[in-house]
Amino acid sequence: SDQVKKENAVFDKYGVKNIQQSEEVKNKTTKSRRSKFYDSLLTTDRLRSKVDVLFTKEEYIECGYYTSFKFRCKTCSTEFLDCLEDGDVPVCPTCNKLSSTFQTEVYDFIVSLNITPVEKNVRTIINPLEIDLYLSEKKLAIECNGLYWHGEINGNKSRNYHLNKTQLCEKKGIRLIHIFEDEWRFKKDIVKSRIRSILSVTTNTTFARKCEIREVDVKTSTNFLMCNHLQGKDNSSIKLGLYCNNELMSLMTFGKLRTALGNTSVPNTYEMYRFCSKLNTSVVGGASKLLKYFIRNYHPSKIISYADRRWSNGNLYTSLNFIKKSNGSPNYWYFGKGNSYKRYHRYGYAKHTLSDKIELFDPNLTEWENMRTNKWDRIWDCGSLKFELFIK
């Protein structure tokens, strides 16, 4: 049969029946992916305005994931090491030392928005637990979570600690958001924009009816997400933008269901990966207009999406007629070894990859046991909310 002939041809060339099992093909695919990642990320405005890159594209392509590379700060000329795999822009450790007043800085920012009263270190809401900041008029609470003191080892914060506080606040009709230390340190402008949006005090307002929809290329999408979304770039295949006077104001991206989240690909079923607007800007009706365009032009039968429970209560999805399907369990990030002020996603530290990333690797230990042995800690989030939209 044709299938047998195909398998034989692949076996003759690569020594395996399935081409995806070939180490040669895997290496080519990885290098191609890293080449595209380099091209998209290292040309973003957010990176180019802050650092000089002191390595070549070839060096990046040949190295393994989560390898540290050298950068030079454009402000103070400090040279430092950082990795790119998490999609964050490398940040100079000299210019961005986080003061012990993390919570005070957030407090001062909120007060500058003329939001009052703002109470500090409140124990009367979910006693005996403490809330860092409470905006009683807005029914909004804010936690400023330093990585060290909110880690599982150093801070003795268990898997459900942050989620539990969120749920206790919800029972009181209070929305709780958690700001992780590295978000405030590295993406302060985006965090401030999110807080403004939650408090409905954005600087600029435009209306979707005055905007036109365009398909957006990878470079433009990457640049916009890196500058305006806390989670940064994505691997979406469909990118839709709202333009006003030729300026990109909002972006919504879609793609296949992600297997890493336990999903299997289903025909005509898509995941909404990202939605964001330009910093400090409210685009009234933007999400609805982009979603309707996607449905009209791509004919999905179902769309799913996930809301980060640290930041979102899912109100955007319910306004778009999504139905909440489930509550996801908390996820964790690693931090500590050589970089105690930055989180690294667990996907980059699966046990089968650890032998090349840590000094002391024991195949008889679990991933977490190996990381602990090497002086890493981890911090848990609040999980995610899964939403679904069925299209008739």
What is each of the regions a protein language model found here?
Residues 1-226, 230-237, 276-314, 335-341, ...:
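Nucleic-acid endo/exonuclease domains
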Residues 46, 206-208, 247, 265, ...:
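A generic structural signal for short, non-catalytic loop/turn and secondary-structure boundary residues
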Residues 70-72, 143, 241-243, 386-390:
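Short, well-ordered beta-strand micro-motif
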Residues 130, 237-239, 382-387:
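Short hydrophobic/aromatic beta-strand or adjacent loop that forms the aromatic wall/cage
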Residues 133-138, 242-245, 389-392:
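Active-site beta-strand termini and strand-to-loop segments that position acidic
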Residues 210, 269, 384:
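A residue-level signal for beta-strand positions that form part of recognition/binding surfaces
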Residues 215, 236, 244, 250-375:
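Acyl-donor binding region in acyl/amide transferases
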Residues 369-374, 378-392:
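Charged phosphate-binding loop/patch that engages nucleotide di/tri-phosphates or the phosphate backbone
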